[in-house]
A protein has these predicted regions:
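Conserved short histidine dyad/triad with adjacent acidic residue
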Residues: 33-48
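Short beta-strand His + acidic residue motifs that chelate non-heme Fe in jelly-roll/DSBH
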Residues: 45, 63-64, 80, 86-92
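Glycine- and acidic-residue-biased ligand/ion/polar-headgroup-sensing regions
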Residues: 51, 56-61
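A short hydrophobic beta-strand segment most commonly corresponding to one strand
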Residues: 79, 94-111
């Protein structure tokens, strides 16, 4: 039996995210983004050719999914269908922590806003 242990700090990152790309880790079937976003942070409008699942761990996220605006709280899961434009932001005064699961071996993103 073989297995892999990774540490979050070993993943590629930017200011508020760590990225796990499945194709770079024994061709794992999914990719995910580990989000730790400061108050006021946001991800601009985009879409993917596969479903994306957001697991809200701490804080509150304001999502736009298609034409719907919703507030997601810790403990909630948001499932966005393939090809549906979406974005989110942290409008609260506290950090937002969530896991964004991409049902694909790599990230494929069509950015719809600059």
């Amino acid at each position: 039996m073989s297995y892999t242990v990774l540490h979050r700090d070993d993943l590629p990152r930017d200011e508020s995210t760590y990225e796990f790309v499945g194709s770079q880790h024994e061709d794992t079937e999914i990719s995910f983004i580990w989000v730790d976003m400061r108050p006021g942070g946001k991800i601009r409008l985009h879409k993917h050719p596969y479903k994306e699942i957001f697991i809200i761990q701490e804080g509150i996220a304001t999502f736009t999914v298609g034409s719907t605006i919703l507030e997601a709280h810790a403990g909630q899961i948001i499932i966005v269908p393939a090809e549906v434009p979406h974005k989110f932001m942290n409008l609260s005064g506290k950090p937002l922590k969530q896991i964004d699961i991409h049902l694909n071996r790599q990230f494929i993103t069509d950015w719809l806003e600059e």
